[in-house]
Amino acid sequence: MKQQFAAKHPWTILAAGAAIQVLTGLPAAWGVFQKPVMEEYGLSEQGAGYAFALLIAAFGVGCVLGGFLQDKKGPRCAALWGTALLCGGFFAAAFLPGWAGWGFFLAFSIPAGLGTAFLYPSIQSCAQKWYAGRKGLATGVIGGAVGLSGAFLTLFVRAALRGFGPVQGIRGAFWALGALTLPVCLAGSAVLSDPPQKKQQPSGKNTLDLSPGQMLRTKQYWLCAGAVCFSTPAVLLFSPIILKLGMERGLDETAALWSIVLGSVGSAAGRMLMPMLSDHIGRRATDLGLFAASLALSAAFWAAQGWWVVVCYAGLTFCYSALAAVLPALSTDLFGLPHAGVNYGFLALGQSVGSLAFPFAANLLALENGRHLLAMAGAAAGFAAIWALRPVQKDPR
């Protein structure tokens, strides 16, 4: 019955997916969580940064696990598990005693990272199957909601820190987010279902159907996963400290907060517009342009002062989020639709590697400039990986 309704109204899949994703943009909004989490749970700045890095790493691993579940049991099952994990992370963080800050990684970072991972690829692959001829549109709408989530969560957490009704402080924010996310994600997950097999066939040229094992044996997989890894430092090295960085470079706290809000707007715009552009000019050309822009913006960000910090950061979030949003369509172009969920998950492992390796390298360098150097080097390496990328010619055996 639900599949028949969706067949007549496929926009319901996009609407359900977008409603869920508006609540899952934790990485984009982490800057507003960082300071209150440090104060409430007794974490150092480095410890809170690692909590963020572990969340991103769990997202990458969860994309593989959620992808397997989505491909075997369908998007609804994967999304329901994602809902349970994400809401469990919110509620566990609210329960966690302040003296047990070491447990924040286990209570929040891992389940929330896994939960968002189970939700994101299940929604993206489901939407692409319903809109097989317009994959950029499908990923753009869902990705745009992820970008807007950063702005929503930033404003929500700031309101909670000021206090409204029973919602007081960061614990109140975690309680309220869990209570809000649970019904929205349950309702949205119930709508998700794959289309009939015939509807999934793209109207274009790609007839490949690579299993995960076959995909892993291609050069294209390693180039794509490498590009995903190299896209991370431009934003993920700075998002946990963007408020502090803005104030160090001449902004007051209110003005520095705009870096998160406008960064979220940039993220939403990148996720919405660039996948649709890639439908017209191609995924490779789109990614090359985004990596080139990321390299230029990373260089400008190094020297930025005052409001230019906000401008450069918003541009970087546009590029980073656009690269992430084009990835699902690039994956199905290269490797086919039938295993889209798990294949995307394996590509997202590049994000896990980057989210852990680059912060570790930056701390090892022990220089603020090290972050900027790594961001520029990552953008250049990502450009080189995409430049070398070519279509898969045949199924590897």
What are the residue ranges of the model-derived segments?
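C-terminal ends and interior cores of transmembrane alpha-helices
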Residues: A84-G98, A293-Q305
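Intracellular juxtamembrane helix-capping segments at the cytosolic ends
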Residues: A117-Y131, A138, A322-F335
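Helix-loop-helix hairpin linking two adjacent transmembrane segments in secondary transporters
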Residues: A145-D194
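C-terminal transmembrane helical hairpin of 12-TM major facilitator-type secondary transporters
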Residues: A234-L237, R249, A255-L330
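A late C-terminal transmembrane helix in Major Facilitator Superfamily
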Residues: V141, G150, L334-L367
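Hydrophobic core of transmembrane alpha-helices in multi-pass small-molecule transporters
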Residues: G101-F118, C229, W308-A322
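Helix-to-loop junctions at the C-terminal end of transmembrane segments
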Residues: G62-P75, R271-G282, A366
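Extracytoplasmic gate region of multi-pass secondary transporters
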Residues: W30-V37, G213-M276
